[in-house]
Curated annotation (Swiss-Prot):
GO terms for molecular function: aminopeptidase activity; metal ion binding; metalloexopeptidase activity; phosphoric triester hydrolase activity; proline dipeptidase activity. This is Xaa-Pro dipeptidase. The lineage of its organism: Bacteria, Pseudomonadati, Pseudomonadota, Gammaproteobacteria, Enterobacterales. Pfam families: PepQ_N (PF21216), Peptidase_M24 (PF00557). InterPro entries: Creatin/AminoP/Spt16_N (IPR029149), Creatinase/aminopeptidase-like (IPR036005), PepQ_N (IPR048819), Pept_M24 (IPR000994), Peptidase_M24B_aminopep-P_CS (IPR001131), X-Pro_dipept-like (IPR052433), X_Pro_dipept (IPR022846). GO terms for cellular component: cytosol. Binds 2 manganese ions per subunit. Mn(2+) 1 binds at D257, H339, E384, E423.
Length: 443
């Protein structure tokens, strides 16, 4: 396997090329990319957890250090001012020496406000990308060059196409997340609470709650009906029926985003439905290829949902085509089939059709779909179908012409289990689709 250092060297070359093109298109001399700053809680001296600017960590795997700056022009070696204060109150990260530091000029920055004296004197044609526009103004950056939309759209569009370095990092993140999912299932089987299952997950992945790329969804029984449930009960339920875990990991700034659902018992209708959703998810992935719209796969899965609703007699006396046409599948899968994945969990440019930022919205019928792109080699996406029994979505169907087709008795029997979601992370290649999750044997 090619070393991470070698892959990173090629990664930087790709970013340099993209930067040259962006600077030429928008007539800028360089980009000043800010890692970000700590922000205090209102009326307090305690900061919120630091989250790095994703455009910064695209260049360097520095994710925990505020007040860092990158100057890139697409030609010269990227210059990183790394914040290195003298501070006995807080931990100070040492000046990095790692696989990537040969390709970046790393300079210590002892004072957060000292960057102004280190930048080129002429800054009128430098673009700033970062979360603190007022800092850019203080440095003399032109207001029109602060987070310029055209530049950001251009960079976002090409972030969709992962370099081999990025894919290597994402495969490592998968390994960590898979370890966490296995530990969490074991904790569930042993009767632990959501809170304790989450601790087991974090321990297995080597993450803290502030390190994971998104808040873990650890949902037992009815809690799986809340799509982004993050409460974490401290007490285990009296009866364990089901467990939905949506949890990821991060490696060098790149995310994994996996979901699995387990039934406490293996011989009930819910367990069979979990198996069937899993089988249909794998069958859909087997059909995926470059050159097809991601929207098509979302539409295809609604056909598969209809098949399962009919098979399990949740909807009766109606064709699968009619179910989809009249959106009877909608309340059972109210979210999109997935989303782009990378430096961010819901990665950027899901709706961009070109490097000018042309936007193609999700279909009106499925507004929560997060991607309308034509699949191309290098893209990484999640495939995460589900079936849920959510009363607020089912309630409107209890009246009206279609109510008679809903097997309400069956639905009531399944509601205590609440929901099913199965999520893998896939890479689009020229002639195949790589399932990073299943390659690690996560069932």
């Amino acid at each position: 396997m090619e070393s991470l250092a070698s892959l990173y060297k090629n990664h930087i070359a790709t970013l340099q090329e993209r930067t040259r093109d962006a600077l030429a298109r928008f007539k800028l001399d360089a980009l000043l990319i800010h890692s970000g700053e700590l922000f205090n809680v209102f009326l307090d001296d305690h900061p919120y957890p630091f989250k790095v600017n994703p455009q910064f960590k695209a260049w360097v795997p520095v994710t925990q250090v505020p007040n860092c700056w990158l100057l890139v022009d697409g030609v010269n070696k990227p210059k990183l001012w790394f914040y290195l204060p003298v501070d006995y109150w807080h931990n100070v990260e040492p000046l990095p020496t790692s696989f990537w530091t040969e390709d970046v000029e790393v300079i210590a920055l002892p004072k957060a406000d000292g960057i102004g004296s280190l930048l080129p004197a002429a800054r009128g044609n430098i673009g700033y990308i970062g979360p603190v526009p007022e800092r850019a103004l203080q440095l003399g950056i032109e207001a029109s060059n602060i987070n310029p939309k055209g530049v950001i759209d251009y960079l976002h569009y090409y972030r969709s196409f992962k370099t081999e370095y990025e894919l290597a990092c994402m495969r490592e993140a998968q390994k960590m997340a898979v370890n966490g999912h296995r530990a969490a299932e074991e904790a569930f089987r042993s009767g632990m609470s959501e809170f304790d299952i989450n601790i087991a997950y974090l321990t297995a992945t080597g993450h803290r709650d502030t390190d994971v790329p998104y808040s873990n969804i650890v949902a037992l029984n009815e809690h799986a009906s809340v799509l982004h449930y993050t409460k974490l009960d401290h007490q285990a339920p009296e009866e364990m029926r089901s467990f939905l875990l949506d949890a990821g990991a991060e490696y060098n700034g790149y995310a994994a985003d996996l979901t699995r659902t387990w039934s406490a018992k293996s011989d009930n209708d819910y367990a069979q439905l979990v198996k069937d959703v899993n089988d249909e998810q794998l069958a859909l992935i087997a059909t995926m290829k470059a050159g097809v719209s991601y929207v098509d796969y979302h539409l295809q899965f609604h056909q598969r949902i209809a098949k399962l609703l009919r098979k399990h007699q949740i909807i009766t006396d109606m064709s699968e085509e009619a179910m989809v046409e009249n959106d009877l599948t909608g309340p059972f899968m109210p979210h999109g089939i997935g989303h782009p994945l990378g430096l961010q969990v819901h990665d950027v440019a899901g709706f961009m059709q070109d490097d000018s930022g042309t936007h193609l919205a999700a279909p009106a019928k499925y507004p929560y779909l997060r991607c309308t792109r034509i699949l191309q080699p290098g893209m990484v996406l999640t495939i995460e179908p589900g079936i849920y029994f959510i009363e607020s979505l089912l309630a409107p169907w209890r009246e009206g012409q279609f109510s008679k087709h809903f097997n309400w008795q069956k639905i009531e029997a399944l509601k205590p289990f609440s929901g099913i979601r199965i999520e893998d992370n896939v890479v689009i290649h020229e002639n195949n689709v790589e399932n990073m999750t299943r390659d690690l044997k996560l069932a």
